[in-house]
Every structure is written in C-alpha cells, then in structure tokens.
Swiss-Prot record:
Keywords: Cytoplasm, Fatty acid biosynthesis, Fatty acid metabolism, Lipid biosynthesis, Lipid metabolism, Magnesium, Metal-binding, Transferase. This is Holo-[acyl-carrier-protein] synthase. It catalyses: apo-[ACP] + CoA = holo-[ACP] + adenosine 3',5'-bisphosphate + H(+). One of its GO terms (biological process) is fatty acid biosynthetic process. Transmembrane segments: none annotated. One of its GO terms (cellular component) is cytosol. GO terms for molecular function: holo-[acyl-carrier-protein] synthase activity; magnesium ion binding. The lineage of its organism: Bacteria, Bacillati, Bacillota, Bacilli, Lactobacillales. It comes from the Bacteria. Gene3D superfamilies: 4'-phosphopantetheinyl transferase domain. Its cofactor is Mg(2+).
Amino acid sequence: MIVGHGIDIEELASIESAVTRHEGFAKRVLTAQEMERFTSLKGRRQIEYLAGRWSAKEAFSKAMGTGISKLGFQDLEVLNNERGAPYFSQAPFSGKIWLSISHTDQFVTASVILEENHES
C-alpha cells in the first residue's frame, strides 16, 4: 500500500548559486559517502549530482508529510546501485522507497513513493 508520494523540482542555477554563496553548502546537504562521490565529479556534473540529492531528499520529506524541517539532510542518504540507479541507503522509513531522479539542462526533478511492507 502506498503511504506517501513526494515530488520536487529545482533549477540547477539556484543550486549552483547556493554553492557559490554559501561555503559548506554541499557538506550540509550531503552525507560523507555522498560527499566522496561529489568531490570525484567535476564542473556541471557536480552541480547536477548535488541538485539531484537535494531534490530527492526534499521529495522524501514531502512523501513523509513532514517537510525537510522535520528531517535533517544527514538523516537521508542517496547512493547508486551497480547499474547506476539511485536509491535511499539511509532513511527513517522501514518500507519500500521508490526513487527516480531526472535532469534537463536547467532542472532536476525527483519523485519518491513510500510503500508499506505487507506480508501475507
């Protein structure tokens, strides 16, 4: 049973601006493992990665119905599986979490669906 659905969209330019204006912005949003991946990337790909994680975490908080103010960015971690698909490796939810992140030249969007585990 689906218990929550959250969607977020961000302009890449606004994330890039936040990185430029606020030293430590990436460290506030990303966990240590996410930060490792972030620092291995260069240029525009770095901004896309950070924006994708930001958007995924915002979408998760909306699916939970709490907003990001009730969750910390460090409470949520998005990694990639062996095929490159993003998944929540850390999140305060015991059921199934469905995550999709997409980019264009200007925007990033994320969708999160929370599904309760039901055993028959």
